Amino acid sequence: MKGEISISVRRLVEFVLRHGDIDNRHHAGADNAMQEGSRIHRMIQKRMGPEYQAEVALKMTFEEEKYFLTLEGRADGIIQMEDRVVIDEIKGTYRDPVKWKEPMPLHLAQAKCYAYIYGTQQNLSEVQVRMTYCHIPTETLRYFYLDYTMPELTAWFQGLMAAYRKWADFTWDWREIRQNSIKGLSFPFPYRDGQKELVANVYRTIYHKKKLFMEAPTGVGKTISTIYPAVQAMGQGMGEKLFYLTAKTITRTVADDTLEILREKGLHFKSVILTAKEKICFMEETECNPEYCPYAKGHYDRINDALYDLLMTEDSFSREKIEEYAAKHQVCPFEMCLDMSLFADAVICDYNYLFDPHVYLKRFFGDSVGGEYLFLIDEAHNLLERGREMYSAVLVKEDFLALRLELKKTIVSDTSGNARKSEVSGQMTLDMTGESADASILIDQTSTVFYPAENTINALSEVRHKGRRGGRSILVREGYADKMVYHLEKCNQEMLAMKRECEGCCLVEDIDSFVQPLMRLRAVMDDYLAEQEDGQLPVRDLLLDFYFEIGHFLEMYELMDENYVKYTQLGDDNSFRLKLFCVNPAANLRQCMGRGRSSILFSATFLPIQYYKKLLGGTPEDYEVYAKSVFDAEKRALFIADDVTSKYSRRSDEEYANIAAYIEEIVKNRHGNYMVFCPSYAFLYRIYAQYAERYGGEGRECLIQGESMGEVDREEFLSRFRGNDMLDLQADIAMEIEEEDSILIGFCVLGGIFSEGIDLKNDSLIGAIIVGTGLPQVCFEREILKNFFDEEGENGFDYSYRYPGMNKVLQAAGRVIRTTEDVGIIALLDERFLQGSYQRMFPREWESFEEVSLGTVAKRVERFWNEWL
C-alpha cells in the first residue's frame, strides 16, 4: 500500500512561486498583520450573509508513482450565488490597499488553489475568486474580483504541481531511507545504571502525547537519552520532526554531536542548527534589502537551487555548511538556514524559535497550527525566566521624547525648501466597471475611516481626499513625520500623567487611555513603513527599533490576563517606564508546546520539580521523573558551614574575614583549581580583598570574573582552568612535587557565566566553594512575584526567592563532578543550608553531607583527600 505525504496550500505556493529580493523595508508590519489576521477574519465573516460559508476545509489527494500527495487548506469563505461560486480569500494588511492595482501574487495563488480544488470536486465550469483586503488601522475593505474557467485553473495548477514534484519525490525517498535506518538502530553505548528506564520514560511520554519533566543529574547522558527514544518514536510514526531547544550555543553543539554519533551507527537523519542572523550574516550590518546586500538581491530566484544542492550532498547542515553553500549560490545564509529546517528531520535551535511571540518559526507554528512535532527542551530550568522575559513588555517615556525630537528636525528641514523627506504622495484611480481577471476593484466604505486632526498641530500636514466613485475621485497625501509627532506627544502626555502618580514603583490598573494613542501611533508607522522603499526619513533606524518595541507591547497587552501585573517605575535618573510583567508564563508556554505532539523538558537542576512543572505549563496528567545519578557519592565531599552566612544583617569585615579563612582552610590541603561563587560583585570584591590580603602570595593565583567579560575574555579565563586537564599522567606525576603548593582560585558570581554551562572535567576543577544561598536581591519585581504566589495559595517566598536561589547553587555545585573519574569538594558556606527548608530542596545525591565549622573544616578536607590520593 502506498504511503502519503501532505503539504498545505499556503506552504506550496509560498515555496514554489517565490521570486525576487529579500527586502525588509517592505514588511515591517507583516508580523503584526498576521497576528491581527484571526480577528480580521472573524470580523469580515460575521458581516456576510447566509450564503457565505466560512472556514471551509478543502483537501485533494493525487496519486504519484510511489506515494499519494495530499494538498490541504482552508478557504476563508465560499459564496454560493445563483449564477456563480465565489472563493473568498481574506488578508489583513497595514498597507493601504486602496493604492494597489492588483492583489498580491502569492495571495492570489493561494485562492486559485482553493478555486481549483473546489471547482474540480463540484464539477464546476468556472469559479470566481474574490480577494478581500482589510486595511487594519481603519478596517476599510477592498475587493478584487477575478473570473477563471476550470481549464484555465487546471493548466495553471498542473504547472504548479509539476514544479513541486521533485521536492515531493525527495521528501518521500528520504523518509523511506530514514525510516529504514531507524529500524536497525540500537543504543550506541552500554546502558548506564538507570539510563534504560530513562529512555523508556521518554518513549512512553511521546507514545501517550504528554509532557515529561525530568530531573537528569550530570552524567546520566541526558542528551542521548532523550534524542535516541525520540528518533525511535519517529521510526514508529510518532513524530514527523524533532526540535531540540536550548538556551545556550554550547548545548546545541552537544545535540549535533549526539546525532553525528547515531549517524555513525547507521542512522540517516538530516539536521540543521539555526544560527542567529547577527552571527551568520555575511555583511557588516543586517540590512536585508537589495540595495545594501548582494545576497538579498535576487535571493528568491536562486534559493531553491541552493537548497536542493545542499540536500543532495549533506545530512548535517551546520553553520559552516550553510555558509559554504549560501556563498556558492549567493543567497542569504540566515534565510537558507531557516528554509533547510523544512527538510531537516531535526532542528536544533534556541528556545525563541518555539516560544518567542515574534521569532517563532511561522512556517511550522503559524496561525496556531502545529504538527506531529517532538520538542526536547534542554536546561529547561532556564525557560522560566526566559518565558517571563519573552511575554513581558516595557516602554520608556524618554524614548517617545527622543523620537519626537528627531522627527521634528525632519519637519523643520522640510520648511527650508528641501525635498519633503517626511512626506509621501500617492494616487489611485479606481475602475468600478470591469469584472474580468484584470481585477475589478471595490471599496467598502461602510467601515469607519479614522484620521486624527493633525492640522491642529502642524500646518505642514496635508490631507486631501480625492477619488472616483460615481464621478468622484480620491487622492491621499499625508505628511508622516508630523502625524507621528502628534501621536508621540499624545502618548507622552499619558505617560506623564502616570509619572506624576508614581513614587518609585507602583502598580497600575487601567492603561487604556495610553494604549489608544499608542495604537494610532503604530498605525501611522505602519503606513509610513509600508510606503517607504528606500528609507526616506533620516531617523528610519531609530523609528524601526521603536516600532518593534511598541508592537511587542501592544501584542502583550492583548495577551494580558490574570497572570500579568502592570506597573510603573521611576528611575534614579528620573527616567520613567511602564511594564507589562508576565508573572506566570505557564499558559503561554503550554500553548506553544501544544503545537507539537509531545514535549520532554529536562535539566540537571530541576528541583523542586512540581514548582517547574506548574510554572512551565505542565498539567496533572503530565509526567515527572527523577533520574538517578551515576556518580559515586564517595568521590564527592559535601561540607556545610555552620558559623558563616551571607545574610545582610551579618555582613561585616569580620564575616568577610571568616569566609576568606574558610576558603584558605579548604584549598590549602590540595593543590589544584577551585572556584569561589559569591552572591554579587560587591560581595566578591570584599571576599577577594580579604583573601588576597591575608593569604595571597607565592603558590596562590587568583582570578576575578569581570563585570562585562566578552567571549574572548571568558575563554581566556576558562583556559587557565583547563590547563591541568591537558596534562598527561607522566607529566602530572613529574610536576606533582614542584607544583605541590600551586593553587588557582577563580572568584566568580553565583548565577553568572561561570556557574552554569561550562564543562571542566578531570582536574580542571576540584572544588566549588559557594557563599550564600543564591537568593535574588530584594526588588519590586521579586516582591510582585512573592505577593502573586502568596495569593495563589503557594509559598510566595519560595517561588520568588528560595527556589531560584537554590537553582543557582545547584548549578554552581554541578561544575565539580563531570565524569565518573572526577573527585572533588563542594562547600556551602552559609548556615542556612542546615535548615529543613533548604535541605528539602537537596538532590538525592546530597543526602550525605558533613556539617563543619571554621575550626574543623581543614581536618575534614584533609581526611577526604587522603582517601583518594
Predicted regions span which residues?
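Walker A/P-loop
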Residues: 207-229
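Conserved RecA-like P-loop NTPase helicase motor core
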Residues: 643-654, 708-834
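A contiguous, basic/glycine-rich beta-loop/short-helix subdomain that forms a polymer-engagement track
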Residues: 322-347, 357-365, 521, 527-645, ...
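Mg2+/Mn2+-dependent nuclease catalytic core
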Residues: 60-154
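Conserved pre-motif I regulatory segment
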Residues: 173-215
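Signature of the SF2 helicase/ATPase Hel1-core->accessory helical subdomain module
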Residues: 226, 253, 329-346, 351-415, ...
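A substrate-engagement module of RecA-like helicase motors
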Residues: 179, 238-347, 352-355, 412-419, ...
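Metal-dependent nuclease catalytic cores that hydrolyze phosphodiester bonds in DNA/RNA
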Residues: 1-83
